[in-house]
Amino acid sequence: PLFREFSTDDWSNLNWWELVNNAQVMNLAALPRDYQAPIQPIDTWHVSRKLGMMIEANVLNGKLLMTTMDISSHLDRRLVARQMRKALIDYMESDSFQPALTLPVTVISDLFTKTAPPVNMYTKDSPDELKPKLK
């Protein structure tokens, strides 16, 4: 239902470039292990952090849908962002918007205030699939 009005595959395609290029992600390590964000970017093959560009949850007495994508600036020139914004608003106004996850407000505020631990992406090693098979 979330992507009913936004043409997409089950993976990122050209439609997503405008939305994800230079966009920030949220570190969702504090969320339940089995929660999958509706928009979940892939980290590198070195590190597999739990990241999201959108979450939906019940918080306090309401429902929350939060995204890090820019769906508000220059919509007259950004057709993809304009369509994603419309799709999200229509979804939130529909009966289909029923978040399965309930979070305390502190988890949401921590997304804005806590600094994620640094990740060192530098390596001198090769990916496992490129290493020689030693016996």
Regions found by a protein language model. Name each.
Residues V80-E93:
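Short amphipathic C-terminal alpha-helix that caps PH/PH-like domains
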Residues P1-L79, F97-K135:
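Catalytic beta-strand/loop cores that center a nucleophilic Ser/Cys/Thr
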